Amino acid sequence: MNAPATPLEQCILDEGLEDLIPLPEIVQTVEMRGLSESPSIVSEVAAVIGALVRDGRIQIWAGPWPAEPEFVAGPLAESLVEDLGQYQFNSPSDLRRRVYYVNVDNLHVDERA
């Protein structure tokens, strides 16, 4: 059973119920909702995304823009969400490979398949 979500975690999970969410978009959403006033908002969001990936509550998808993203698992998924450049549109990291997340209650890929 998962612990109750913080407002930041809940925002990330709720947004992920809608569609594949680009990492830069969730940072903008968190800022607009005033869920973090930290100057290190990107680091804060990245830490929560990483924890949710490790907990199996969200999954990561990635691919070059504008191609359809593909499911990414394991160490690659974790390394992508730890790259703070992925949280800004048109950064070098984002231009190489745009990273998305989705709430597993919306879309779940069996990692063993």
Mark where each language-model region is.
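Short amphipathic alpha-helical interface segments
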Residues: M1-S43, A47, R54, A62, ...
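Short alpha-helical interface elements
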Residues: R33, E37-S38, A51, E70-E78
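Short, amphipathic alpha-helical interaction segments positioned at domain boundaries
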Residues: A67-A113
